[in-house]
Amino acid sequence: MKGGNLMKLTIVSPEGTLYEGTADAVSFPGLCGSFDVWPNHAPFNAALTNGTIRFRIGDTWQEQPIKGGFVTVRDDCLQVCAG
């Protein structure tokens, strides 16, 4: 999905897939504070703390509570392994 206005977001936990789809902005609960990811973001990995992942699809924000985990961002693909 590189170069587009949407990112592919996948959130999985031990219980299964919590969300799989697209988003145009995502906010994460990082260990050192919340942070946002937008399309064309530089690649990185980050640890997550207990909190809520917020993601926007068009004009609508959705929320997914998590119990920690980590996120990998690369080529507009965001993969979250949540606790």
Predicted regions and their residues:
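Short, Lys/Arg-enriched N-terminal segments with co-localized hydrophobic residues
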Residues: 1-6
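Compact, glycine-rich, soluble single-domain proteins
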Residues: 8-83
